[in-house]
C-alpha cells in the first residue's frame, strides 16, 4: 500500500487541507495506520495533538517492483502519513481485500493537514499484484496531520 505520484517535489500547505484517514482497529484498543503499522496514541484520538510521521524515508523513485512504464513515478512511504481526499475513497480503501478476518475493524477520521506542513498528492496503490481497482483513488501524504473527528467505522 503506498501513494504513487508523478512529482518528486514536496509542497507546503498554504492553508489547512481537509482529508480522511483510515485507521485499522486491531486487538483491544490498538489502532494502526495501514501504511506505517504505527500505533496511534489515545491522546491523538481525543483531538489533543497532531500526529507526526515516523521514519526517514522521503520520496523514492519507483523501483523494479513497479512496471517499467511507471519508472518516472515516485513512491511516498515512510516519513509520510497517507490520507484520502474524499470520504468515499477512504471507505473504499478501508474494505478488507485479501484477508477477511472476523476481527477486522476500521475507522475513518476526518483530519487536516496543518498549514505549513509538507505534503505530496498522488494516487493510492493497494497492491503490486492483485486488486488494481484502487489504483485511481486520490490520496495525499503529509508529514503531519491533525485528527478532527471520526466519520464512520465497522
Region annotations inferred by a language model:
Residues 1-81, 87-154:
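Conserved NAD+-utilizing ADP-ribose enzyme module
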Amino acid at each position: 500500500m503506498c501513494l504513487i505520484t508523478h512529482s518528486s517535489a514536496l509542497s507546503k500547505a498554504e492553508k489547512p487541507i481537509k482529508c480522511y484517514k483510515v485507521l485499522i482497529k486491531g486487538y483491544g484498543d490498538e489502532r494502526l495506520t495501514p501504511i506505517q503499522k504505527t500505533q496511534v496514541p489515545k491522546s491523538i484520538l481525543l483531538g489533543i495533538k497532531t500526529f507526526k510521521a515516523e521514519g526517514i524515508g522521503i520520496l523514492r523513485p519507483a523501483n523494479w517492483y513497479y512496471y517499467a512504464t511507471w519508472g518516472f513515478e515516485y513512491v511516498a512511504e515512510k516519513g509520510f502519513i497517507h490520507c484520502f481526499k474524499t470520504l468515499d475513497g477512504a471507505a473504499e480503501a478501508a474494505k478488507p481485500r485479501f484477508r477477511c478476518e472476523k476481527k477486522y475493524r476500521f475507522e475513518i477520521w476526518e483530519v487536516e493537514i496543518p498549514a505549513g506542513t509538507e505534503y505530496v498528492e498522488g494516487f493510492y496503490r493497494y497492491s503490486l499484484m492483485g486488486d488494481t481497482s484502487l489504483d485511481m483513488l486520490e490520496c495525499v501524504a503529509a508529514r503531519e496531520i491533525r485528527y478532527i473527528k471520526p466519520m464512520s467505522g465497522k
